[in-house]
Amino acid sequence: DYTGPWNPSPGQHSSYNHARRGISFWKNKVGINPSKLTLGVPFYGYDFQNSTTVKSFTYGSMVDSDVSNSEKDNVGNKYYNGRPTIANKVKLASQNLSGIMIWRLGADSFTEYSLLETIHKTYTDLGVETTNLCGN
């Protein structure tokens, strides 16, 4: 996370650009083989209520309050990853990375707005076989 309760400055904690820069750092500055990198994606967000209070929430709760939130990355001072950002991160991870890691699966929306379903659909659309993507 690039921001959160330890840094109550409102902003995106896990943007696409943060992911891209992080991957670039590990590949180009440190020399890690991309196939050894796994991209973590959040199924949660942070609500920067004021300058001293930051609370976490689930992606599912955002969709429960308004299904159009699934297409956004923030509502006011609530920051999270919506379906378009998750799909773009999957495309990024499909460029020779080992895959996607989800924190926290139980925070998903178990509806047609599911982030897990977005991940599966994006990998499928890219022609990536998904049956062997689960680790131990």
Please report, for each region that a protein language model flagged, where it lies by residue.
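Low-complexity, flexible helical/coil segments
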Residues: 21-27, 73-77, 133-136
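Generic detector of bulky aromatic hydrophobic side chains
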Residues: 26, 33-39, 77, 92-93, ...
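Soluble or luminal CAZymes and related metallo-dependent hydrolases
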Residues: 14-21, 78-85, 111
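Short, surface-exposed, polar/charged, turn-prone segments marking secondary-structure boundaries
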Residues: 16, 20, 65-70, 128-131
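Substrate-binding surface in catalytic domains of secreted glycosidases
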Residues: 1-64
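Acidic/aromatic/glycine-rich contiguous surface patches that form carbohydrate-binding/processing clefts
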Residues: 82-136
